[in-house]
Amino acid sequence: MKLLTLNTHSLIEPDYEAKREIFVKFIAAEQPKVFALQEVNQTAAAPLLGDAPAGYYPCPGNRVPLKADNHAAAVARMLEERGVHYYWSWLPAKVGYDIYDEGAAVFSRAPITAAENLLLSKTNDYSNWKTRRTLGVCAGDVWYYTVHMGWWKDEEEPFAAQWETLSQAAGAKQTAFLLGDFNSEADVRGEGYDLILRSGWQDTYRLAQQRDDGYTVVQAIDGWRDAPDAAAKKRIDQIWCSRTVAVKSSRVVFGGLQEPQVSDHAGVLIEL
């Protein structure tokens, strides 16, 4: 089976509609069993969507209604129009760039039977840009979490505290995958990446029989512009599993080589 993660940037991205079309075409062709998206937004002031596309599974505790330009809803609809059906859920975490409801989404080919809404940050202020939530869904007997973490050196909302909450919740499941933007460089020792490893989680990139360099960020992006290594290549988008699994391959997608760039991040596609 194939799993994919992408920090999609969605409505913020220049040429958004054209890039969304490229992404949907790729998903329709590859049909990963599950794909997880971060920075999935909608305009807060937009009209209500009305009826949600087929397969929508509301996340517990989400009081923000779907709006007409919701990125996840648009992706679901466009896939449905191509005859490719996914079950999906969306969870907003905060106000983004002053005008968006920003959150994360998970899409699954198998029916979603449960969903989990995890507050990872200390703050629960929807207007605070440091608020972090994670959406988990159960499909079959496996849980999949779409993850967008804070930074290791953030004194107010440190990565380590957020990881403890996530690891305890996801680690209690029989099998769980964490897919997303961890904001922790795999090449930096003694920080977030090593903490995840020490917690017993398995990096599917390292398990893969075939893999590329894995770098998903190759230029300065929001959240990293003030870092000493702002412009350096980073492998911060990752897929982890709670146990060792056989991974055939792991490759960067939408990095501008095999597929066009559709976001300020590239994505990761693995095959088990």
Predicted regions: what is each one?
Residues 8, 30-53:
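Short, conserved active-site loops that position catalytic residues or coordinate cofactors/metal ions
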Residues 13-15, 44-68:
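Short, flexible/disordered intra-domain loops and linkers
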Residues 1-34, 58, 80-81, 85-272:
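Active-site regions of metal-assisted phosphoester/phosphodiester hydrolases
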Residues 66-86:
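Alpha-helix-centered segments that form part of catalytic cores
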